Amino acid sequence: VQFTPDLLPSDVTGTNVYNERDRTFEFAEGPIFANVVLADEINRAPPKTQSALLEAMEENQVTTDGTTRGLPDPFCVIATQNDVEPGQTYELPVAEVDRFTKKIRLGYPDTEEEAAILGRLAGDHPVDDVEPVATIADVRRARRIVGEIEASEAVREYVARLAVFTRRNARLGASPRGSLALVRASQARAALEGRDYVIPDDVQAEAPTVLSHRIRTESGGTDGADVVDDALDRIRVE
């Protein structure tokens, strides 16, 4: 979905369309009814349109005209953000930002990476050769495996103390939703490392990308990443 200033909430969630033949209204699903939704340049759309994602990202459902409809399972939203044109973008609502598990800054490719990109684009567009790498069943199985990874009481307390530190040292710290996201991300990392349990290294590796975007600081040069780094330096596993 290309997010633009004139995009409406119904353009995302769907709307009721009148069927002249049957003289009834039929619901036409919006693009949010998919397993993976890519919101391109999400901050170019006004907050009212962005709010259409809140219920979907939290409850895997959307409500239109008083009717609630479930979304496909699995359901995931991936968004890109335009940071180049600040005068033509909107600030993302805190409630929306908090629903994203991670924020990853890609930056520019280095020389070798850019040369490789140019080589891949010299012929046919890579999208023409895209092949599935996993089925829906594979994703559900992976999600179940990650959910079974053990996060001990010590690890959970470590995550909680990191979150509390951010709340005490920022205008707006990490929410309980952020703590839960950090535990889940740490479980996923442990699974990728071939372990059935989380270790502090998992938490420390995931914390910057999971917590930083949720934190708001006072003006003065520091940002969420600085607060997270400070928390990791000061808080020890007990």
Task: Give names to the regions the model predicted.
Residues 1-3, 11, 58, 111-113, ...:
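Non-catalytic accessory segments flanking P-loop/AAA+ NTPase cores
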Residues 1-21:
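AAA+/P-loop NTPase substrate/partner-engagement loops
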Residues 12, 53, 100, 159, ...:
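Residue-level signature of catalytic and energy-coupling elements of molecular machines
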Residues 18-38:
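Conserved alpha-helical scaffold flanking the Walker A/P-loop in AAA+ ATPase domains
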Residues 19-24, 44-49, 57-133, 140-149, ...:
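Canonical AAA+ ATPase core
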Residues 40-41, 52:
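Walker B catalytic acidic pair
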Residues 129-179:
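Conserved AAA+ ATPase small/helical "lid" subdomain
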Residues 168-238:
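C-terminal engagement/docking regions of AAA+ P-loop ATPases
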